[in-house]
A protein has these predicted regions:
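Juxtadomain coupling helices with adjacent low-complexity linkers
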Residues: 110-113, 117-173
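Sensory/regulatory domains in signal-transduction proteins
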Residues: 2-134
Length: 173
């Protein structure tokens, strides 16, 4: 699905008790979306099914975070992350995501499962400048892959500087 959605700056918010749930196949194509996901993303169920989960990627979201996410999932580990998503109408919404691999009976990864909740606004205000710095690093490079790797290195450097791992950092915000 090709899209040219431009961010409008309008922010939408999940309810305190709402939970976005989605499942994807091994390539990140959506195989399940609950009603909250459909409402927040503003796509129909039919539009979401089979579409890459990156359909809702906001341009202010550093690619380095997604590299870490995919690296972690491929290592058969879960990951928590703050993510800003872009809805079909250009509005956006922040989530605190918990993403896990789904395994078959032999321990092989067969897909991915994500639960997303409303994050605390204080945590979002803490992560925004970090994401802005990482996106700026990505933008300094003509080649997107080079930018992602430079941003990833900057993120790793920040974590080393603070003496924490990614999980500890995210859960301490």
């Amino acid at each position: 699905m090709t899209r040219t959605v431009r961010p409008t700056g309008v922010e939408n918010f999940l309810g305190e008790e709402e939970l976005i749930v989605s499942k994807t196949d091994l390539k990140g194509r959506i195989t399940y979306a609950n009603d909250v996901f459909i409402r927040m993303a503003k796509y129909t169920y039919a539009e979401l099914m089979g579409a890459p989960h990156s359909l809702i990627r906001h341009p202010d979201m550093p690619r380095a975070v997604f590299k870490l996410l995919w690296d972690t999932l491929q290592a058969k580990q879960e990951i928590f992350a703050y993510v800003v998503n872009l809805a079909k109408d250009g509005s956006h919404y922040w989530v605190f995501a918990h993403v896990t691999p789904t395994f078959d009976e032999r321990g092989n990864i067969v897909g991915y499962h994500s639960n997303r909740r409303k994050p605390d606004s204080v945590q979002i205000e803490r992560i925004k400048p970090i994401y802005k710095t990482l996106c700026a690093e990505e933008a300094r490079h003509a080649n997107a892959k080079d930018g992602m790797h430079a941003s990833f290195d900057a993120m790793v450097g920040l974590l080393k500087q603070q003496g924490v791992g990614y999980d500890e950092f995210v859960l301490s915000l």
